[in-house]
């Protein structure tokens, strides 16, 4: 069984930061696999990143000098693929093209059986009322392809509920119980479920999301990853003994926790 982790560019870049934690904290298990076509993304070229603690580079066996906007890393030991998307789409209107032309062929090429999508949302932007437990921070929704009849019926949207749907089955402790057509996850699911040549090996889709605000979300992303691992969302994902940042975070993310320094300000 192989799984692809796909982070969405969303609030606070939490999914991307969580991928950074995952890769750099277990750098001995991950390696650079390939760069995907980034024609629908904002252009990006940067230096090759590496773990801050001096561990082996993720690019150690790759003959390259620069990193690009859309790269795939592979954990052969655990059958895991992880995409790191470093820039957003040029326009949200290209999301459908991105899924159909870039992601679906990748799923087929490597016979991916499960895709795990990571996302982050603003709690205050819930026009369609999908957030039903705002006291919770995380959500986990799942879709399985076991029943083709159920799949076909799920593609039909009730006219009275056209702004939301229940394609995903959320856990009882999730902050949301449906998805909105305004969410990128809706378009992603729609394109995968309606694909004329759906990847044959694909058996399940999992959607992990968290509520957040913009800022230095390095701690939020670490806790998000910890939650994903604790829930065994990705069955083969091992616990992280020591969290390691990438060197690219220096001066940008991951400042020491300064919350205690503001105590006197509010007393």
UniProtKB/Swiss-Prot annotation:
Annotated keywords: Chaperone, Cytoplasm
InterPro entries: Proteasome_assmbl_chaperone_2, Proteasome_assmbl_chp_2_euk, PSMG2_sf
GO BP annotations, alphabetical order: proteasome assembly
Entry-linked Pfam families: PAC2 (PF09754)
Statement: the UniProt record of this protein carries the keyword Coiled coil: no
Coiled-coil regions listed in the entry: none
Localization per Swiss-Prot or TrEMBL: Cytoplasm
Domain of life of the source: Eukaryota
Gene Ontology CC annotations of this record: cytoplasm; cytosol; nucleus
Subunit text: Component of the 20S proteasome chaperone. Forms a heterodimer with PBA1 that binds to proteasome precursors.
Entry similarity comment: Belongs to the PSMG2 family.
Function: Involved in 20S proteasome assembly. Required for maximal proteasome activity. Affects the chymotrypsin-like activity of the proteasome. Can be degraded by the proteasome. Involved in the endoplasmic reticulum-associated degradation (ERAD).
Extra remark: Present with 2940 molecules/cell in log phase SD medium.
Name the UniProt record assigns to this protein: Proteasome assembly chaperone 2
Origin species: Saccharomyces cerevisiae (strain ATCC 204508 / S288c)
């Amino acid at each position: 069984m192989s799984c692809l982790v796909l982070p969405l560019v969303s609030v606070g870049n939490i999914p991307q930061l969580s991928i950074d934690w995952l890769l750099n904290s277990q750098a001995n298990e991950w390696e650079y696999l390939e760069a995907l076509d980034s024609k629908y993304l904002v252009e990006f070229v940067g230096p090759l990143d590496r773990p801050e603690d001096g561990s082996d580079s993720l690019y150690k066996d790759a003959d390259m000098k620069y990193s690009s906007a859309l790269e795939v890393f592979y954990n052969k030991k655990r059958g895991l693929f992880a995409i790191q998307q470093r820039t957003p789409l040029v326009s949200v209107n290209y999301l459908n093209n991105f899924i159909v032309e870039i992601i679906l062929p990748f799923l087929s090429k490597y016979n991916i059986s499960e895709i795990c999508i990571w996302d982050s949302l603003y709690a205050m932007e819930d026009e369609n009322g999908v957030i039903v437990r705002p006291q919770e921070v995380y959500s986990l929704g799942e879709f399985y392809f076991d029943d083709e009849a159920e799949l076909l019926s799920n593609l039909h949207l009730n006219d009275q509920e056209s702004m939301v749907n229940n394609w995903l089955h959320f856990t009882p402790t999730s902050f949301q119980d449906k998805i909105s057509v305004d969410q990128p996850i809706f378009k992603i699911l729609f394109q995968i479920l309606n694909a004329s040549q759906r990847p044959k090996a694909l058996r399940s889709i999992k959607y992990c999301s968290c509520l957040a605000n913009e800022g230095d979300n390095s701690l939020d992303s670490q806790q998000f990853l910890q939650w994903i691992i604790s829930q065994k969302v990705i069955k083969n994902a091992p616990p992280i003994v020591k969290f390691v940042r990438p060197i690219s975070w220096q001066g940008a993310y991951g400042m020491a926790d300064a919350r205690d320094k503001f105590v006197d300000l509010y007393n």
